[in-house]
């Protein structure tokens, strides 16, 4: 049986992460530990033309109608997609964010208060740790495997010992493990 990694911990990761990300800017360093391709590989001229063409056709009201909780038609389509997979969710229950990290931050802000304990998969993507640090949360690491996902035994042990307010998981294409959590 696997066990939670140590006890809960207050985080101090942002400075270290920013040092690593800053090193990516040094052209003498090959960033093997990050997913940033060489900037010279980007077709910037072509991307610029595509963006300019898209901007010419942009509905001026989109800057207002697409504000949170999101574009109404997109929310309807997402609700239909959930329904096709067996989950009945109304469009009013869906909030569209500009990315996974904004969604994670909103969820953690809604569910926790500074000093609360959350469980995270280990290893995990650093930005989730930064969000936890910024919100003043403590974390307990739960071992995860790319084939089997989070150790349910370790999670149960942690839940029996501590009051866990939220559980942070990356269920599909986990970073850094690359796995998809089984059903």
Predicted regions and their residues:
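Conserved core of the PLP fold type I
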Residues: 51-183
